[in-house]
Amino acid sequence: QQQVRRQKIFLACSCLILTAGIGLFVTLHHNHQRAAAQEAELRKQIKQKQEAELQKQQELENNTIHFVAVGDNLIHQGIYESADTTQTVWNYDHLYEHIRDDISAADLAAVNEESIFVSDHANISSYPAFGSPVEIGDALVTAGFDIVEQANNHVFDKGITGITDTIRYWETSHPEVALLGIHDSAESAGEITTISCKDVTFSLLNYTTTVNNEPYDELPDYAVDLLRTDQVISDVKKAKEISDMT
């Protein structure tokens, strides 16, 4: 009887221990599942927050246009002589190497090119009447400029030939660049130059108040955009009709 009693007690204790063990296992398993679920939910929330922040930043970037404008780019003798002038083609990339990253990082970059260009190195000149090598223009494009403003007081330093040669250079060598301020015909002068960036179209206007190298007998009315109130009003009105911003 005592043996049977001890067996019953042992069996009861075993059942109790087994039940407790099962209960502990179930509790631990449940806690583990709950912790795993909480961790998964936390990771999900963090990911959603990161994605929302990334989307917000992307939307902000898509609706932000970074614009850089610099000048004057006026090429004196010491500057154009900084190239290896013993070569047939001169190189001026070094002039802009310290700003190239800033210029290239912008969505749009404009430069006021203060001097006119000449294709023949023999015609290069400095103060007071400037004529710069066309390779300066190549270096500007390499630096990342999209817009070149040519209307300024030195635009007539090489006469009408300098203006037309500069136009030909930009049109043939870098047609992707938006050229402003000078024209080779009345028809061209009547057109508004535009440029698009991130689904926004800009109208670009460029004027000069004065032109050196008087008298102006050789200078056609259409060749240079001069700052005249009536003309500016007319241009701005036309620009607003074809673009989002002027």
Where on the chain are the PLM-derived regions?
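N-terminal targeting leaders characterized by basic, low-complexity, disordered sequences
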Residues: 1-2
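Acidic, metal/ion-coordinating pockets
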Residues: 7-246
